[in-house]
Amino acid sequence: MRNDLETLKHIIDSSNRITFFTGAGVSVASGVPDFRSMGGLFDEISKDGLSPEYLLSRDYLEDDPEGFINFCHKRLLFVDTKPNIVHDWIAKLERNQQSLGVITQNIDGLHSDAGSQHVDELHGTLNRFYCNACHKSYTKSDVIDRTLKHCDNCGGAIRPDIVLYGEMLDQPTIIRSLNKIEHADTLVVLGSSLVVQPAAGLISNFKGDNLIIINKDRTPYDRDATLVIHDDMVSVVKSLMTE
């Protein structure tokens, strides 16, 4: 492990166009449940009788707007979550002009909360909301502080600005993400299984020098990586910062 940390530190220190790609594992340490792993949010809400995929779908929003709104308020508004050391480390490297930014599969908005400026949120963010009817914009604090569920302009359902099942990923976000990956000298993957498509397929466009994967479990890209660390990323980053 120590040799891996030394290699990681050397690569990070010698890179000046790092792109980060993050998944659910990064946010677990902040108290955000992993949507897919055992014991995660998907397992918890599937006990309610409807599939998690349906509860997070465009169909559910259209079939039962009230049910969808109530589900979002009950299950998705992570009020007390704060960035952890991994989010802070990524933001610091961007401030130091070593990083092109971060691409994330997460919807919790914690990268922005940590101070990262160049964040591409592939699946949207819970930091923004909008009316499903008239598209008036709302902030997360608007929704939480006022327990706001319906638009004060037209009465429509206020939904989070996330990509639901049955919706397309935002193409400008995909293009920016591809640009980050194609121009990176080092790509650091953190806390992602790299199996959820099409987001994970973006990794195949990396042509730089160093692909680093830090994840508890194996990924389909491990064999192509310069360095693979199967460990808890919070522990890895803490150790790295004390090297």
Curated annotation (Swiss-Prot):
Enzyme class of the recorded protein, top EC level: transferase
EC number: 2.3.1.286
Cofactor note: Binds 1 zinc ion per subunit.
Residues holding Zn(2+): 131, 134, 151, 154
Any one GO molecular-function label of the UniProt entry: NAD+ binding
Reaction(s) catalysed (UniProt annotation): N(6)-acetyl-L-lysyl-[protein] + NAD(+) + H2O = 2''-O-acetyl-ADP-D-ribose + nicotinamide + L-lysyl-[protein]
PROSITE patterns to which the protein is assigned, alphabetical: SIRTUIN
Assigned GO CC terms: cytoplasm
Catalytic residues, chain numbering: 123
UniProt: nicotinamide binding residues: 35, 107-108
Residue span(s) of domain Deacetylase sirtuin-type: 1-243
Subcellular location: Cytoplasm
CDD domains: SIR2H (cd01411)
Primary localisation category: cytoplasm
Record's protein name: NAD-dependent protein deacetylase
Organism field: Staphylococcus aureus (strain MSSA476)
